[in-house]
Amino acid sequence: MARGKIQIKRIENQTNRQVTYSKRRNGLFKKAHELTVLCDARVSIIMFSSSNKLHEYISPNTTTKEIVDLYQTISDVDVWATQYERMQETKRKLLETNRNLRTQIKQRLGECLDELDIQELRRLEDEMENTFKLVRERKFKSLGNQIETTKKKNKSQQDIQKNLIHELELRAEDPHYGLVDNGGDYDSVLGYQIEGSRAYALRFHQNHHHYYPNHGLHAPSASDIITFHLLE
């Protein structure tokens, strides 16, 4: 029984389509290689799958560029002409844009104004005024920030100065430094400035021989003070 003719149409199943593509691609490359070996032909095949994956075959001892150049020479068709024209058009547009920008910069510097009519001059004037307004607003904002920063610094310095003055006033009223309580054991230290730059620490030491009869406390006396040399 003769085999029925296979209908050529798109394979809907993606997996089957990919398998068929791989098999037929390998078969095509095999035939191209046979043509190269058997017939001394130069063959170049460029293929893209449905997922845009590139596959290509090129005969040994040649390149794709050589094949394309040979095709252009024999067929008298410039493959790169269209691409070159596009590149030239892009270059022309970029040069035109560059010239316009240079002209606008010069006009904002007061140059190239003779070629402008009254409407263009008014439009340029409005643009410059808006620019000046934005610059002034930014300048005032920057100055305001600097003023606020300076005020905060001055306030901090004033607070430090007030604290120092307050401390000096306290020391002027009482040359002794503050008595430090030492957890209820009555051993305390006084800072005392005497004899120029010499500093001494005076420590009260509990003396059990001095006793307050009414309160059950020992009273400090001269013998309870111990002097330690601190600085010289």
Swiss-Prot record:
Changing residue 61 to D: In strain: cv. Corsacalla-1. Residues 3-57 form the MADS-box domain. Expressed in petals and stamens. Changing residue 115 to K: In strain: cv. Chi-1 and cv. Gr-3. Gene3D superfamilies: Transcription factor, MADS-box. Changing residue 159 to N: In strain: cv. Li-8. CDD domains: MADS_MEF2_like (cd00265). Keywords: Activator, Coiled coil, Developmental protein, Differentiation, DNA-binding, Flowering, Nucleus, Transcription, Transcription regulation. Pfam families: K-box (PF01486), SRF-TF (PF00319). Residues 84-174 form the K-box domain. Probable transcription factor involved in the genetic control of flower development. Is required for normal development of petals and stamens in the wild-type flower. Forms a heterodimer with PISTILLATA that is required for autoregulation of both AP3 and PI genes. AP3/PI heterodimer interacts with APETALA1 or SEPALLATA3 to form a ternary complex that could be responsible for the regulation of the genes involved in the flower development. AP3/PI heterodimer activates the expression of NAP. AP3/PI prevents GATA22/GNL and GATA21/GNC expression. Forms a heterodimer with PISTILLATA, capable of binding to CArG-box sequences. AP3/PI heterodimer binds AP1 or SEP3 to form complexes. This is Floral homeotic protein APETALA 3.
